[in-house]
């Protein structure tokens, strides 16, 4: 690419802003691109910045997906489906997301059944004074919104709401 002084300055501004953004935490390529566009950097400068960061290993969607999946699965008790949906929203390729989720689930010995049981038991306590049908309906909705598989949700709700 043939650079002029003004173009180098504009590129440097975009690059420096991207570095500042990444210093606060990892980002996906799509998130960082969107963030730079919101700060009104030229498309060419954003593309060159993304390319340079990727070449230098500072922007890596596979690494981002693993970090994201690990924090969501271990600290927030999210399901595989919910993590995959969140990563897709952030522009991470499905293959990268699936690989990262599988790696995290096996590395951390995470059992999705245990996650759903813990989340359901915790939430169920807040429904103690409600009618049994209302308890079932609310618990099912809560677990479904967390992204757990319908069969697993149904089984867990039945087990917890059994008289």
Task: Describe each PLM feature range.
Residues 1-163:
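An alpha-helical, amphipathic repeat domain used for nucleic-acid recognition
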């Amino acid at each position: 690419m043939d650079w002029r002084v003004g173009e180098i300055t504009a590129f440097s501004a975009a690059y420096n802003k991207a570095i500042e953004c990444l210093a606060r935490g990892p980002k996906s390529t799509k998130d960082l691109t969107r963030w730079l566009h919101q700060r009104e950097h030229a498309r060419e400068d954003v593309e060159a910045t993304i390319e340079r960061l990727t070449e230098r290993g500072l922007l890596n969607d596979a690494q981002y997906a693993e970090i994201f999946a690990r924090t969501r699965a271990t600290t927030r008790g999210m399901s595989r489906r919910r993590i995959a949906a969140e990563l897709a929203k952030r522009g991470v390729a499905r293959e990268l997301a699936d690989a990262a989720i599988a790696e995290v689930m096996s590395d951390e010995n995470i059992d999705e059944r245990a996650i759903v049981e813990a989340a359901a038991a915790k939430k169920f306590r807040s429904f103690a004074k409600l009618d049994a049908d209302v308890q079932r309906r609310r618990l099912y909705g809560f677990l479904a919104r967390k992204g757990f598989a319908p069969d697993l949700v149904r089984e867990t709700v039945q087990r917890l709401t059994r008289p």
